[in-house]
Curated annotation (Swiss-Prot):
HAMAP family: UPF0434. SUPFAM superfamilies: Trm112p-like. GO terms for cellular component: cytosol. It comes from Paracoccus denitrificans (strain Pd 1222). Signal peptide: none annotated. Belongs to the UPF0434 family. InterPro entries: Trm112-like. Pfam families: Trm112p (PF03966). This is UPF0434 protein Pden_2369.
Amino acid sequence: MTDTTERGYDRHMLEALVCPVTHATLRYDAEAQELISEAAGLAFPIRGGIPIMLLNEARQIRA
């Protein structure tokens, strides 16, 4: 078992990140390059390998 995802992200680093709204864990979507907060209904983009954890950059994933 490896500690990196298919894109080379450190799993431990991704596990340490939490939703800035709910403080819930995030799910990594490799295809969309986003960190998903199911609890808040938001998707935070990853650009150039850097998670953008700003609310004004997040995409709403449910109404």
